[in-house]
Amino acid sequence: NDYAELEGKWDTIAIAADNDAKIKEEGPLRLYVRELYCNEDCSEMEVTFYVNANNQCSKTTVIGYKQADGTYRTQFEGDNRFQPVYATPENIVFTSKNVDRAGQETNLIFVVGKSQPLTPEQHEKLVEFAHENNIPEENIHNVLATDTCPK
């Protein structure tokens, strides 16, 4: 099971998006991840996270259902398709596409980890990966420091 290393407790380290308003502080897609869980064949992935709006942390769990193309689909602030694209024991990088109720599309990158900020080298890789996804460097947010929600 390739996905065994995905399971467990994680924190969001960095988020990038081509629509910055969605992920800036208090943005609806600034997700502070806490836990990932897969069922046996990982056809379902459960993601538990907080969103912080008006200094209120609200905890949410969504279940992503694996699609034929390998992405997971779930509903949160619209329609989402996400997938892990890179995983090590320390970090997982997800790409995600959100289409909100107004039909606006946002492409995102989430980096989750074990409470450690990105090294300069990891940050550099993230900048390159963001560019490949047409996301400018200034839209990369290191969100670990702003995560004040319960562990």
Curated annotation (Swiss-Prot):
Pfam families found in the cross-reference section: Lipocalin (PF00061)
One annotated GO molecular function: small molecule binding
Species whose genome carries this gene: Phodopus sungorus
Tissue specificity as recorded in UniProt: Expressed in salivary glands, hair and urine.
Keyword presence, Secreted: yes
Keyword Transit peptide attributed: no
Family from the record: Belongs to the calycin superfamily. Lipocalin family.
Function: May act as a pheromone.
Disulfide bridge map: C38-C42, C57-C149
Gene: OBP
Keyword tags: Allergen, Disulfide bond, Secreted
Subcellular location: Secreted
UniProt-listed InterPro entries: Calycin, Lipocalin, Lipocln_cytosolic_FA-bd_dom, OBP-like
Protein name from the UniProt record: Odorant-binding protein
GO CC terms: extracellular space
